[in-house]
Amino acid sequence: MLSLKKYLTEGLLQFTILLSLIGVRVDVDTYLTSQLPPLREIILGPSSAYTQTQFHNLRNTLDGYGIHPKSIDLDNYFTARRLLSQVRALDRFQVPTTEVNAWLVHRDPEGSVSGSQPNSGLALESSSGLQDVTGPDNGVRESETEQGFGEDLEDLGAVAPPVSGDLTKEDIDLIDILWRQDIDLGAGREVFDYSHRQKEQDVEKELRDGGEQDTWAGEGAEALARNLLVDGETGESFPAQVPSGEDQTALSLEECLRLLEATCPFGENAEFPADISSITEAVPSESEPPALQNNLLSPLLTGTESPFDLEQQWQDLMSIMEMQAMEVNTSASEILYSAPPGDPLSTNYSLAPNTPINQNVSLHQASLGGCSQDFLLFSPEVESLPVASSSTLLPLAPSNSTSLNSTFGSTNLTGLFFPPQLNGTANDTAGPELPDPLGGLLDEAMLDEISLMDLAIEEGFNPVQASQLEEEFDSDSGLSLDSSHSPSSLSSSEGSSSSSSSSSSSSSSASSSASSSFSEEGAVGYSSDSETLDLEEAEGAVGYQPEYSKFCRMSYQDPAQLSCLPYLEHVGHNHTYNMAPSALDSADLPPPSALKKGSKEKQADFLDKQMSRDEHRARAMKIPFTNDKIINLPVEEFNELLSKYQLSEAQLSLIRDIRRRGKNKMAAQNCRKRKLDTILNLERDVEDLQRDKARLLREKVEFLRSLRQMKQKVQSLYQEVFGRLRDENGRPYSPSQYALQYAGDGSVLLIPRTMADQQARRQERKPKDRRK
């Protein structure tokens, strides 16, 4: 087999090279079907890529197809698979594709036109653009190709010399197969065809003559080289007919530019930061003459009006439109260019997209004042933002308001309209800028927005109710005693007149064990006002301490708790949003030693916050013993403790108030415990009853099943006994006239059906009479 293959291939190669020098080209389609499977096997060789098929179903040719066993399209012709695919495609809407077949009509050099051969080797299948296409997209591309070439293809003459009459069709097809393999290996027709090399010399001569006559110089030659198309099979070069600017029916580049300027004006104010290293282009205004409006592509267009093809023009147009999505590099060492107002050349465009556009944009100002008709994300008054120079920040809305409780309900618009890389309030530092993919998600502005969401939008809460709700979180008695959330239900204790009880957060300080009797102080005068703490020392320069929102789980926790964690000691936030970029250096982070010291102080402040209001008062009054002793000691020990110290009247009054409130809280805890025990006992009783009910239902089902089985057995026994009974003549009794009756002693009697029916009716009347 190997020797035969080697012998055939060597001879065919020599024969093919000889014919390819003549210029004969053949079609490979006839050898890719089932006409000559042995020759195809010799050419392709046994390969596992062609044998991964279902060999038990190779001869399933009910639909009329004859496929070679090594064909790669064999799976598509299996009858079962094809029918199954058709059934599955019934529930999908499919647009039928338009098949367009195009053949190159050529003629001999003498002028005789050869007829088109649909199934012969003239059907071009290479990637040169003149190909047999199938599908709507390829059909459009083919029509454009035919429109672009037009009559030039007819003027070129024959693509191939006439086929010699000495060669058969099989020889020509085999030569074409091997010649295509040469093309795949990189040896085109230009290696063998002398006429092709002569044509290339003629084309180069025409180019040199045209360069002397025209003013194109280098650009004209490049444009003409772009317009020369090379056929991948024949290797011939032919110029593509480019529609001129006068008779071009599609949109020209100037019209597209005017349309682009009308829709996306590059107006008086630049939308991008200026860059002195970028290419300076004159941006036309409406008052300038139309001649200046074509200068937008000055770096891309040549100095003269060189003829561009349509594809090149659209590429240039798309490069301009991509300038709106480019990224601009900004660093602290860049020197930016700013021109005086009114200068038409004051706008510079950077063509290097690297980093996001709004690097220092204050995104806290992105919440608009109202949703009116002038609702614009980017207002026309957008100003360019220099990074290193001192200037105002980029305004994103006509109303430069920093109020976060505006018409939009303090919704952060930056998360809605900006991508994550734009949604960042980056503070310029001296270090290098590192990419932060989570910068937009964990943005400080977004976290502040979440924490600032007013509770008034859910269930009518106001800040007063929110503060009461915070007190009830840690209060031991404010949750289960039917405490109301209305402002009128706010009760006050004896110490509510203190100045430190206005804005507060609650913390529990009472013990959960009741170890003493309540003979002296009972549960009278109980108040739901829990122990609270001032936030005035925690406000500081920040000003307002927001309520912690219910919508974000992280916002339930006090931010002061997070600051005392060891792995967050190095985290520092710069909240100087409305400062100029030049003033950001003064707001840098403190050194690590200061951070550690600050974290210890914050931890101490956090411990102070955990103390109740009574503990703060006791510490302020310098009471010598703790609140736990005041509340939990029995009466005798408590009196002895008071007698050991010389206390003033104010101190004694505060101690009694603390003990009374603590006893009331412990009594409320015991009351809640009793109620909870009662509820738990009822719950256990209900569960026991439910278990008993389920057990009884199961027993009932079992009894009904056994009763049904007994009835079936009795019925079968009844039919068996009745079928064996015979009269005097030996004939069986009729079931419609006679019936069996069971006696109380176990005997069975045969009675007429009428008497049995009467007895059954009497038995049915007895329960009815008893009910009456």
UniProtKB/Swiss-Prot annotation:
The modification Phosphoserine is found at S528, S599. Residues 682-696 are annotated as: Leucine-zipper. InterPro entries: bZIP, bZIP_Maf, NFE2-like, TF_DNA-bd_sf. Keywords: Activator, Cholesterol metabolism, DNA-binding, Endoplasmic reticulum, Glycoprotein, Lipid metabolism, Lipid-binding, Membrane, Nucleus, Phosphoprotein, Repressor, Signal-anchor, Steroid metabolism, Sterol metabolism, Transcription, Transcription regulation, Transmembrane, Transmembrane helix, Ubl conjugation. The cholesterol recognition/amino acid consensus (CRAC) region directly binds cholesterol, as well as campesterol and 27-hydroxycholesterol. Has much lower affinity for epicholesterol. Interacts with KEAP1. Glycans are attached at N348, N360, N412, N423. Residues 108-148, 470-532, 582-613 are annotated as: Disordered. This is Endoplasmic reticulum membrane sensor NFE2L1. Residues 656-675 are annotated as: Basic motif. A motif (Destruction motif) lies at residues 476-480. Residues 598-613 have a biased composition (Basic and acidic residues). SMART domains: BRLZ. The record marks W103, L104 as: Cleavage. Residues 476-523 have a biased composition (Low complexity). Residues 654-717 form the bZIP domain. It comes from Homo sapiens. Residues 379-383 are annotated as: CPD. One of its GO terms (biological process) is glial cell fate commitment. Pfam families: bZIP_Maf (PF03131). GO terms for cellular component: chromatin; cytosol; endoplasmic reticulum membrane; nucleoplasm; nucleus; protein-containing complex. Belongs to the bZIP family. CNC subfamily. GO terms for molecular function: cholesterol binding; DNA-binding transcription activator activity, RNA polymerase II-specific; DNA-binding transcription factor activity; DNA-binding transcription factor activity, RNA polymerase II-specific; identical protein binding; promoter-specific chromatin binding; protein domain specific binding; protein-containing complex binding.
